[in-house]
C-alpha cells in the first residue's frame, strides 16, 4: 500500500495536498483536491453554488461552498478503517463555483446554474455540488436530466413543496 503522501492526482500528476502540508495555508478546495478549469480527465467534479437569493428568511447559505471547502481540509485522503482512498478509485477535482452573470436576477441565475451543470453532464463527469439555498436544486436537475431519468434522495425535515411566494415559483421552499 502506498503511503498517504505518495498519492498523485491522476488529473494533474501532482501529489495531493496531504497531512504533510498545513491545513490553514493555501487556497481551500473541496477535500484539498486540485482546482482545475477543465473537465478533461475528470470522473467527478466538485462544484460550489454560492447562492441564497431564493431564501425568504435567514440568508447566508451562499457562504456554504467556501466554508465546506475550508472544513473539508480536515478530511483525510483515505478512510482510517477501510483504508479506501476514493482518489485512487476516481479522478476527482474541484472545478470552482458557478459564476452568475446577473446575481440579483433569480431566473438568470437559474439559467447560469443549469448551463454550468449541463456542460459537466455533457462531458460525462459526475457533479457533486455544495450550495447555496434549496432553490439551486431545480436548475441543477434541469442541467443533468437530458437523456435518461435520474434518481434523487431527498432528506429534509419537511417536504419543501410550496407554491408561488411573492410572485415567484423559484425559492427555497420549492426546490423541485
What does each model-found stretch correspond to?
Residues 2-176:
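Conserved alpha-helical scaffold segments that buttress catalytic/binding sites
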Amino acid at each position: 500500500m502506498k503511503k498517504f503522501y505518495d498519492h498523485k492526482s491522476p488529473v494533474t500528476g501532482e501529489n495531493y495536498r496531504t497531512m504533510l502540508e498545513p491545513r490553514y495555508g493555501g487556497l481551500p478546495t473541496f477535500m484539498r483536491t486540485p482546482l482545475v478549469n477543465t473537465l478533461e480527465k475528470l470522473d467527478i467534479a466538485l462544484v460550489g453554488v454560492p447562492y441564497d437569493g431564493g431564501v425568504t428568511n435567514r440568508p447566508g447559505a451562499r457562504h456554504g461552498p467556501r466554508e465546506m471547502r475550508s472544513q473539508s481540509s480536515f478530511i483525510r485522503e483515505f478512510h482510517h478503517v477501510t483504508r479506501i482512498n476514493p482518489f485512487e478509485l476516481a479522478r476527482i477535482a474541484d472545478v470552482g463555483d458557478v459564476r452568475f452573470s446577473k446575481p440579483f436576477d433569480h431566473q438568470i441565475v437559474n439559467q447560469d446554474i443549469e448551463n454550468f451543470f449541463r456542460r459537466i453532464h455533457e462531458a460525462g463527469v459526475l457533479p457533486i455540488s455544495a450550495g447555496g439555498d434549496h432553490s439551486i436544486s431545480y436548475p441543477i436537475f434541469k442541467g443533468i436530466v437530458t437523456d435518461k431519468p435520474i434518481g434523487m434522495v431527498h432528506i429534509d425535515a419537511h417536504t419543501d413543496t410550496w407554491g408561488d411566494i411573492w410572485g415567484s415559483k423559484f425559492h427555497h421552499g420549492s426546490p423541485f
